[in-house]
Amino acid sequence: MQNLTVALDAMGGDFGPRVTVPAAVQALSYFPELKVILIGDRNAITSQLSSLGRMPDSRLSIQHCDRVISNSEKPSLALRNSQGSSMRAAIDLVAESQADACVSGGNTGALMALSRFRLKLLPGIDRPALVSALPTASGNRTWMLDLGANVSSDADSLFQFAVMGSALAEQHLGRVPRVAILNIGAEEIKGNDLVKRCAEMLSNTQSVNFIGYIEGNQLLQDAADVVVCDGFVGNVCLKTCEGTAQLFIDKLKTRMMASTIKGWIARMLFSELFTELKTLNPDQYNGASLLGLRGIVIKSHGSADVSAVVNAIGEAVHEVKRQVPSRISDRLEAVLLERHY
């Protein structure tokens, strides 16, 4: 069994060690091969461990850091003043091969800037991209990128996102994934020059199974395995999907928990529907990968609860086992050779 180490930014996210420490302990019970380095304020981390009846051991260690990068800190400022911060220390461990992956729920812009600075980009990649899985009506998943690492992108970057997303999805699915571009229509004539140029490039690439355009109303319909868009569009779509799913879950939960006869009827009629809707809960898909780097970095939701952070750690474990950066590099090399000839 392959042993692996995850560096967890214990101070990242809205709740810090109150969530990250219990999540680390749970993750250790799920993954026997896992070691976790908790990075942050030693006293705060130790206090949470004590409340769980757990202390540092051979699989769970603490690295003290005094500083936390705030969510309001600009990436450029965070990059200059990152020394001594929990996020920087977690990324440094990956850069120095002391950890196989990093997980953080902290400032997204700072995480991207620091990761790019310390880990560097893979050959053939101009920009990293955030990718995460979305649930679909069929029970499968669709990987979408970019989710906000870049506000705007050119056609070459979108093409690179498609290659990276395809390589990642293939490691999860065990088959060649279907890749589509998010557009305002499915017809070839629809869209701006950006998506048309990217579509032309993908159509001429045998290494990617490009199936054309899909529209926003198809995102959760299992119409594609990988959906490509720029970071502005992707982030808006992701937040809209998450908000809509949470709205339905909360509304139904409120109705079912009512102590009236209506609540009893709702529980009788909608219990199965509620179970189905819970599969749309964003927490179950927490853990966005920052693709295109020479190391594995997973971004957790800032508002993530314990189970959601466990899922983010689980994504890190999966990507380490599947050697995702190497798979992406191999795919890029094949695509570059194909385009050259």
Swiss-Prot record:
GO molecular function, one term: phosphate:acyl-[acyl carrier protein] acyltransferase activity
Reactions catalysed according to its record: a fatty acyl-[ACP] + phosphate = an acyl phosphate + holo-[ACP]
GO cellular component: cytoplasm
Keywords: Cytoplasm, Lipid biosynthesis, Lipid metabolism, Phospholipid biosynthesis, Phospholipid metabolism, Transferase
Keyword Plastid in annotation: no
Pathway(s): Lipid metabolism; phospholipid metabolism
Predominant localisation class: cytoplasm
Gene3D superfamilies attached to this UniProt entry: Isopropylmalate Dehydrogenase
Compartments where located: Cytoplasm
InterPro entries per UniProt: FA_synthesis (IPR003664), Phospholipid_synth_PlsX-like (IPR012281)
GO biological process: fatty acid biosynthetic process; phospholipid biosynthetic process
Superkingdom: Bacteria
EC number of this enzyme: 2.3.1.274
Family: Belongs to the PlsX family.
HAMAP family reported in the protein's UniProt record: PlsX (MF_00019)
Function as written in the Swiss-Prot or TrEMBL entry: Catalyzes the reversible formation of acyl-phosphate (acyl-PO(4)) from acyl-[acyl-carrier-protein] (acyl-ACP). This enzyme utilizes acyl-ACP as fatty acyl donor, but not acyl-CoA.
Assembly information from the UniProt record: Homodimer. Probably interacts with PlsY.
Protein name stated in the entry: Phosphate acyltransferase
